[in-house]
Amino acid sequence: MIEIENTFFTLAENCQRNCLVICDRGAMDASAFVPKKDWEYIMAKNGMNPVGLRDTRYNHIIHMVTAAKGAEAFYTLEVKSRSYGSYNSGTRQLLSAYLEGDHLARSESLPAAQMLDDRAAEAWIGHPYFDVIDNSTEFDTKLRRMISSVCQKMGIDTGDRLAIGAKKVKFLVRSLPDDSKFPKFQDFEVVHEYLKASVRNTQPRLRRRGQNGHWSYTYTVRRPKINGQQVEVKTQVTQRDYNLLLGQKDDKHFTIHKTRRCFLHNNQYFQLDIYREPCHPRCKGLLLLETYTTIEGKQLMKRLPEFLDIVEEVTDNPKYSMYNLSLKEEWEITKHFCHKLEGPVDELGNPVLINGVSNVVLEPEHLNEALSKI
């Protein structure tokens, strides 16, 4: 499977046009169906590790929740009976599945399908860009949610064609409960560095994210909002490129250190950021919970983990923006506090340069070219 994927990845990298490689299942899925010791042996024998297989191999993970969880009426093992003339039984079954939509690959009972779905989802806990698409909507809307999620991660503006109200929400948490209160989780060490920018209302930054000595590196450009949605274009970079880009570090900001705890709860993927020292006093003991959802108000509050003491929602509160939290100067005196990342943009949503200032923010599509000249 990995060799087949590598072939397609290489073809895509060598293509002169933009390519999107979509994998039906990924390397970590196998870990859900073999004993943990066996999986660790397989990885060790092949020189692999979870960060490489789970976090850096794929840019985005989407888990489509089985119909057995939330859409049970549409989960069936039976092939409907209809006459297809003199075709043999195998052909009749294929025709039935093709014309009537039954799923020939299903063999699990409802409880078994639910259990296997949980295992498959848990295999990807910890991936930095992991979306769970549940069955809270009709199937067509479920597909639109999936497509919209991909477009959002790629920085593609879909206008209102796929508008379904999903957004990132953030909550302030009062205190960290004992680990035993959490469902299965993965902890990561995360380090953020803000970079210098000469383009108004853009925020370039680097991220180093790792576990057990294995690291992934990401370059992000945060742009002004498009149609009310914040746009962040992310690109994976190598360790060498990361070190080169650190030369652009913005001295107005502290380095941000976090432990990021990733877990699933109620078919919802959550990330709990636990801020660590060294940091500005404003960040000491800070706990922020994030998730992407279409739910709002009281219904959303009911979906939040009951084992966490939620203080309030702080989604659009600039006091809890990582950009502002990392500022070295006190907020009362600094000129760099960002109240809202908005500004003039062109018809494509790109920031308009102010007074002819040249753009020194490295856009992801030009990143490799720029790094090759350093």
Task: Briefly describe each language-model feature range.
Residues M1-C19:
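Short, structured active-site "lid" loops
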Residues A71-A73, K142, Q299-M301:
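Short active-site-adjacent structural elements
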Residues S148-I374:
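Phosphate-end processing signature that detects enzymes handling 5′-triphosphorylated RNA
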